Every structure is written in structure tokens, then in C-alpha cells.
């Protein structure tokens, strides 16, 4: 199955993350904190915590820093309590945007997200206004040049739902959220390490943007992603 290229978007985001390592760590620590408080500190029994730890390792967070934050989240020490809130809205050309946040102050967060939408050409919507245009899936993306046949064989055998080849040769493996970890482990055991892997919100249909519209949309997305309380931003724009 062929699909739109996601490779440029991944490289753009990786470049920005390299520039903002401290902020990335802060977001991952929030994820570890929420996951550990919700499901406990036993990594073997907490898939969400395992995913957060994988992100921490990918961001080169030291093991002792990871352990400290798990212990802090599951111990008796006082700490911030984070609330998970999702916002939805529209960007340039009517593109759909989902913004997932973790916050200790929802009044501050909604004001910042709303301001970003309005200042940079978007519109904040109501709950459910765009989420129906996305599916909750596991997603693993391999660089152009990876063996499509090998990825497909291993992924489908491990329980993947689909393997998509993008127009630039990047390969996208899609799974049910509950099968994500098993498929990822099988691929890595076969020597196939994805360049990006996460449980995400994937758009059913993409909207093509080019030229000035694409630049404005990218600016809006970058501004939203830079907000302190924002964890993830999903959209259906093909930039």
C-alpha cells in the first residue's frame, strides 16, 4: 500500500528536538510521572511506562535520571499532579489538529493553546470536532532504503495490521495499540530498528498544503509544540 511521505516531517521534528533537548526531557519526565502514578513502577506490568522509558532512552536520558523519576512518581514524596487534557482545532486550509497536554494548571494551558491557534491562523474547536478524522494506532517508520520485503514479512507475522510504503521509500508499519510493543520487539529482534516508533493518532485522510500555506501551517505547529504543557501534536496536513 502506498502513502504520503512522512519522512520530511520526521526529520524536521528530530532537528527541532536536537535543538531543544531540555524541553524534550521535561516532556518525557511528565510522561514517566503520569504513567508510573497510574500504573505503578513495575515496568514489566506497565506498558505505558515502558513506552515512556523507550522515549527517554531514545532522547539519551541517563538511566539513573529515569529511575529517579519513576521512584519519585511512585513514592510518598510530594510532587506536581498532572492532568491530561486534549484540545482540537483547525489549522491552515482547514487541516485538523489535535493537541495533547499534561498540565498542573488547565486555565493557563487552554489560554496558551487558544492564543497559539488564533495568532497563527488557526481556530480552536470543541471536543470531538476533529478527533473522528484520526485513528489510534501503533506506528513504526523505517528509513528509505530499508528492505520492504523483510519489514513486511516480520511485521505481519508479529501481528501488524498494515505495512505502507510512502512515496519517498520510507516504510510505515501500523498496528493496533495493544500489539505495538510485540511488533516493535519482533522487528528489532530481526535487526530492523525503526527511526520513529510510537502509539499515535494517525489521520484517515491528509490535506495537501504547499507554498505559503505549508509554511504558515508549519509555523503554527511549531509554535504549539513549543508550549511548555504540550506533549504531542497530531495533524492531517501533508507538508
From Swiss-Prot:
SUPFAM superfamilies: YebC-like. Gene3D superfamilies: 1.10.10.200, 3.30.70.980. Keywords: Cytoplasm, DNA-binding, Transcription, Transcription regulation. GO terms for molecular function: DNA binding. GO terms for biological process: regulation of DNA-templated transcription. Pfam families: TACO1_YebC_N, Transcrip_reg. It is found in: Cytoplasm. One of its GO terms (cellular component) is cytosol. InterPro entries: Integrase-like_N, TACO1_YebC-like_2nd/3rd_dom, TACO1_YebC_N, Transcrip_reg_TACO1-like, Transcrip_reg_TACO1-like_dom3, YebC-like. Belongs to the TACO1 family. This is Probable transcriptional regulatory protein Aave_3203.
Amino acid at each position: 500500500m502506498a502513502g504520503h511521505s512522512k519522512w520530511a516531517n520526521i526529520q524536521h521534528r528530530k532537528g527541532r528536538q536536537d535543538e531543544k533537548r531540555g524541553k524534550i526531557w521535561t516532556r518525557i519526565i511528565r510522561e514517566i510521572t503520569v504513567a508510573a502514578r497510574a500504573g505503578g513502577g513495575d515496568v514489566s506490568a506497565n506498558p505505558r511506562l515502558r513506552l515512556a522509558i523507550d522515549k527517554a532512552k531514545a532522547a539519551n536520558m541517563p538511566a539513573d535520571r529515569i529511575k529517579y523519576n519513576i521512584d519519585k512518581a511512585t513514592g510518598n514524596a510530594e510532587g506536581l499532579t498532572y492532568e491530561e487534557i486534549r484540545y482540537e482545532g483547525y489549522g491552515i486550509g482547514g487541516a485538523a489538529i489535535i493537541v495533547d497536554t499534561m498540565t498542573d494548571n488547565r486555565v493557563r494551558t487552554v489560554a496558551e493553546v487558544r492564543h497559539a491557534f488564533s495568532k497563527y491562523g488557526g481556530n480552536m474547536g470543541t471536543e470531538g470536532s476533529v478527533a473522528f478524522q484520526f485513528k489510534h494506532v501503533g506506528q513504526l517508520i523505517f528509513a528509505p532504503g530499508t528492505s520492504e520485503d523483510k519489514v513486511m514479512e516480520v511485521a505481519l507475522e508479529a501481528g501488524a495490521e498494515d505495512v505502507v510504503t510512502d512515496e519517498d521509500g520510507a516504510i510505515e508499519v501500523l498496528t493496533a495499540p495493544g500489539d505495538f510493543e510485540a511488533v516493535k520487539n519482533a522487528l528489532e529482534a530481526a535487526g530492523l530498528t525503526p527511526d520513529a516508533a510510537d502509539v499515535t493518532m494517525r489521520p484517515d485522510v491528509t490535506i495537501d498544503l504547499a507554498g505559503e500555506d505549508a509554511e504558515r501551517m508549519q509555523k503554527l505547529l511549531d509554535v504549539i509544540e513549543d508550549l511548555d504543557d504540550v506533549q504531542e501534536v497530531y495533524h492531517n496536513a501533508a507538508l
